[in-house]
Amino acid sequence: MTVPSPLAARRASSTLAAVKRPLRILLSLAGALAAVPLLYLLAALILAVIPANPGWHEARQGVRIFVRTNGVHTWIMVPKVSADMDWRPLVPGADLKDPRWGNGNYVALGYGNRQFYLNTATWADLTVRNAFWALVGSGDSLIHADHDNDPQPSDIQRPIVLSHDEYVRLVRFIRASFRTDARGRTIPLLGRGYGNSDVFYEAVGPYNAFYTCNSWTGQALRAAGVRTGVWTPLSDSIMWRLR
């Protein structure tokens, strides 16, 4: 029987160690990557529970808005005309595929990733590529304006009454999210809606996993002074407080 020489044994041991080291590094990286979604969800849960504006109470009289959700995305629904703001010049019915929808008295405004908005009309259109860009961000963002009439409270549409001062602050935040042209007009993507009642507008700001559509909604509510989580990347981060 041939006995391996000490030199051969040392070489084999050295080769095995050389293989194990990068393998350990790869396994450590894989473990770290696997932990990222869990840490994200944990942070989302904790920071949604910690309230901004903890002393806020809903106004008895004022402007009635709604926060709407489809389970993933949220919108803020505002009356088109009030003593404090007329939204019709910013989101006119003339921008819609069917301008008759512009006769409604409310408009739902939401913020989102450009690629995801334009290429994911329904969840059946969701692709890995669209989801990836929605998470990491692809630069441009859009405002989605969906015209409605006489919205009613429901599980997916929660009313909030704001004082006039609170509503003015909300309006200021939302208006600042619209990108405008040299004449101060909003910039619609004509013909690029999901149906006859909605249309997209160019928006200001980035979109990524840390500043999502729901983060925007939460920031808008915090700007108004409403009690909201300090970070609200998920729809449930917002809606659970409004039950």
Pin down the residues of each PLM region.
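Charged/polar interaction segments and conserved charged motifs
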Residues: 5, 9, 118, 122-127, ...
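Short, exposed beta-strand "edge-strand" segments with a Pro/Gly-rich flavor and a Y/T-containing core
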Residues: 11-13, 155-162, 227-232
